[in-house]
Amino acid sequence: MKIINLGILAHVDAGKTTLTESLLYTSGAIAEPGSVDKGTTRTDTMNLERQRGITIQTAVTSFQWEDVKVNIIDTPGHMDFLAEVYRSLSVLDGAVLLVSAKDGIQAQTRILFHALQTMKIPTIFFINKIDQEGIDLPMVYQEMKAKLSSEIIVKQKVGQHPHINVTDNDDMEQWDAVIMGNDELLEKYMSGKPFKMSELEQEENRRFQNGTLFPVYHGSAKNNLGIRQLIEVIASKFYSSTPEGQSELCGQVFKIEYSEKRRRFVYVRIYSGTLHLRDVIKISEKEKIKITEMCVPTNGELYSSDTACSGDIVILPNDVLQLNSILGNEMLLPQRKFIENPLPMLQTTIAVKKSEQREILLGALTEISDGDPLLKYYVDTTTHEIILSFLGNVQMEVICAILEEKYHVEAEIKEPTVIYMERPLRKAEYTIHIEVPPNPFWASVGLSIEPLPIGSGVQYESRVSLGYLNQSFQNAVMEGVLYGCEQGLYGWKVTDCKICFEYGLYYSPVSTPADFRLLSPIVLEQALKKAGTELLEPYLHFEIYAPQEYLSRAYHDAPRYCADIVSTQVKNDEVILKGEIPARCIQEYRNDLTYFTNGQGVCLTELKGYQPAIGKFICQPRRPNSRIDKVRHMFHKLA
């Protein structure tokens, strides 16, 4: 049986969830389609999802059409969850991108299409809601060519009499994009030679599989119009990305979720081989797991199974596997399946409104962050505050909704701040000697620090031989240095530097590793004071698509948001701007873009890295440490 993993993507309210229900119903997987309005759909399981008509977390369902099984990965539609969209896309064999016949190409549609092109995923366009009044399909096609891709092939005609209907498009004009993209076919066309239909279809299929040609189909998901034709196309056009002739197992985890009873489940895409119940599977050089229970999606439901075949999705109860964990032979994993997630750029504190719910909150955050690589948290050991780091403000709104709905916890979140870093300005050394006041520790430590190029991270080297200072003391120095790097002169993490352990001395038998561990961060701080530090802040690459009249406004606003526009291009009455901007400014820049373009502007961003901060220095309160703070202050007075 052929297995296809299909993604359905759309802008908010284009009908994505309704289309999923219609596909399940038309294929016979379910007896009655669910309704977004009534909250009875199978994929949007959260109240927030149903209330907004958007998808926040990936859901999996399936149907069968003749000898083809289709797993539907109902991917998130909100752009604050682009990282989860990419993670979902990584398991897909193909995608259906919805376009609302009434609303046309929205900013969100373009961002999703950009993601599909980035991942080179074969994509079908489905123009939904064609039964609404005032629809101008030629205008929609024109907009698709201008804002998405000129390489579209309209596969159907839409008729109005005696009632609205869709039929195959047999006009020769539909093949223009196919002919113009192939030199051999174009030469035949220019010389007036006849075409074989098989030639055109073969070239269409080749380019479709390469993700460079996009067939267009039509319908109404709400009224099941054109859905059967869409199912037939899905079953015939998409191929599984599973390598042929491979019997060895290879699978990858793409989703983690917890049940209401706090049971942990991992979703795995099988790329090759077959997974059997009671198999013992290698997940690392030293670690193996035994498969004791497994489920697969079948006809709209999840069923227990003894096997999961190549190409399928399998759900395993497991406490060991992590996101992107690989089961079996990782050499068989398709290259584009390796997805890097951006680092969280914002941080804040979160607290419960009722103190007795604190432990519940901590457990909930552990589960949520387990399945979301863009969310991290820790508890300050002194203030006991819960610190969250994350990517976007809407992400926080959704987390609060999950906490309230799933865990019944009411939380308060402070205004977030950007996560800065510190980098030494120059090379410096500092040594604190044993028995020299105010050093209370039975240890001498000398450190040197020097800046490295931005993006290098922290490098540590010991230049003290193990014959002179044993391993336990050496390890303690490194641990103390790494602890000291957590807070620089302004309270931010220290990065992009090389730290060398230059000198160490101990007294036997009174010296202990703790003496070196506690002294090292104090020595590091003094070295940083001599070197000085600069603040680094996260920067983003941005790419803006907007009506041409927005150009002057963009240049006018750029200095206000510290944005640097590096290139400008005008295409089809649209301006394309590329540049860089501090992450702290992007939300306001986006808000202005939306306001001044009446929602037509699109802003694509990705993390560029850290650069020297512009403007005033932002300090973060230092986390107290009762064991070393008194000594720190003594050395501070000496400086």
Curated annotation (Swiss-Prot):
Keywords assigned by UniProt, alphabetized: Antibiotic resistance, GTP-binding, Nucleotide-binding, Protein biosynthesis
SMART domains: EFG_IV
Protein residues bound to GTP: 10-17, 74-78, 128-131
CDD domains in alphabetical order: Tet_C (cd03711), Tet_II (cd03690), Tet_III (cd16258), Tet_like_IV (cd01684), TetM_like (cd04168)
Gene Ontology MF terms in the entry: GTP binding; GTPase activity
GO biological process: response to antibiotic; ribosome disassembly; translation
Main function: Abolishes the inhibitory effect of tetracyclin on protein synthesis by a non-covalent modification of the ribosomes.
Protein name: Tetracycline resistance protein TetO
Source organism per UniProt: Streptococcus pneumoniae
